[in-house]
Amino acid sequence: MSSSRTIIRGGLVITASDELHADILIEDGRVAALAAAGTSAAEAWTAERTIDATGKYVIPGGVDAHTHMELPFGGTFASDTFETGTRAAAWGGTTTIVDFAVQSVGHTLREGLDAWHAKAEGNCAIDYGFHMIVSDVHQETLKEMDLLVQEGVTSFKQFMAYPGVFYSDDGQILRAMQRSADNGGLIMMHAENGIAIDVLVEQALARGETDPRYHGEVRKALLEAEATHRAIKLAQVAGAPLYVVHVSAMEAVAELARARDEGLPVFGETCPQYLFLSTDNLAEPDFEGSKYVCSTPLRPREHQAKLWQGLRTDDLQVVSTDHCPFCFVGQKELGRGDFSKIPNGLPGVENRMDLLHQAVVDGHISRRRWIEIACANPARMFGMYPKKGTIAPGADADIVIYDPNAVQVVSADTHHMNVDYSAYEGKHVTGRVETVLSRGELVITEREYTGHAGHGTYTPRSTCQYLN
């Protein structure tokens, strides 16, 4: 039926592997064909809707493989719901998120997963999948991991941090890694030595060091590196692949690089906050620094160059946001007088694609690498490629028309995330999302929201495609 056909004409199509001036035919929510602009094949297409992308980039929708909508943390909840968070993601050119369902201690994986399905179903503007946070490893949990992999939840997050909440000890981590080595799942690790960090927190507070900047000082880069090294060795013993989340320290990048040089299936993710922000932000006066409290913490500025280098050399493969927003008023303020009570997390799901385009403008990465780390690699890593993460016949028509020349100023006044501040307030960025399609449906139309809650569907995933 012609009513479900769309043509995008005249744009520069950029994927992880190619840049070409091509027209795109979309049919029934999928990419049906690409043809060089101006050719007879492209000219022969007809459709009800034609989008003019002349002078623009045509890129795959972003895949943000690390978000926390409605996450309970520190006595409060992340301020974005699945409805507000996925709408904001669409505004930022992201068309798929993978969020984290949480197993609470004493409960089953299934109970946690069901709870997250209930939060998301019917509320999302874009497609979504789930990872599973495993906080209580025992024989029943391990059996459940096999079942979850079979139904498309193919990655499991463990924490070496947060004793008493999400923490797993080395024995629990090893057991889960052994299980994932057998069932094809991928262990995602929050690599920080939480036991040692808790000692440093206690000592800092006893000295009266209560301001937000001490959050960064106690969560030492060496303790991120140590935990990264330990996670790599445990994975090696288990014969399992490993994905280290939110890498922030150059010493941790060095551990990943060493493991990869040895040929181990070890992967790393970093986030825009570590590439663009630093401990200078944590030290902002009048408790403003609390806006930048996240874990792993922001590092001194000299770490940024090593993170960019890791992205260029493929020692880091993915940039996700770890989007976990808490309002300054009433939420971040819970930690006034005690930095350890500041809810950990930053808003960013709307900013990632633009910040990484700015990195292209600044010469840190190429255009294709931008698409690779923001779209293709996360889709491959988490079993969604080539349905997601690229523009090719058969792929979902998750497509962004991107204006590479528009200049914008990032601000809480104009963003769509449900949070009262921007981590990048006042930053000038070159490049802006103009139009977004999710499975061929217009979600953002020339800078206007035309999507709706419930369009986004749950996306089961296959196992990590880097290992196949």
Task: Map each language-model feature to its residues.
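Histidine/acidic residue-rich metal-binding segments in metalloenzymes
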Residues: 140-319, 335
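His/Asp/Glu-enriched, well-ordered alpha-helical/loop segment
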Residues: 210-239, 313, 317-319, 325-406
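Divalent metal-coordination and catalytic microenvironments
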Residues: 11, 24, 29, 55, ...
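Histidine-rich, glycine-flanked metal-binding segment
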Residues: 1-60
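C-terminal cap of metal-dependent C-N hydrolases
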Residues: 11, 333-338, 393-459
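Short catalytic-loop micro-motif centered on adjacent basic/acidic residues
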Residues: 98-99, 129-132, 241-246
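Metal-associated gating/positioning segment near the N- to mid-region
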Residues: 53-123, 140
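Alpha-helix-loop-beta-strand connector modules within alpha/beta enzyme cores
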Residues: 110-126, 174-189
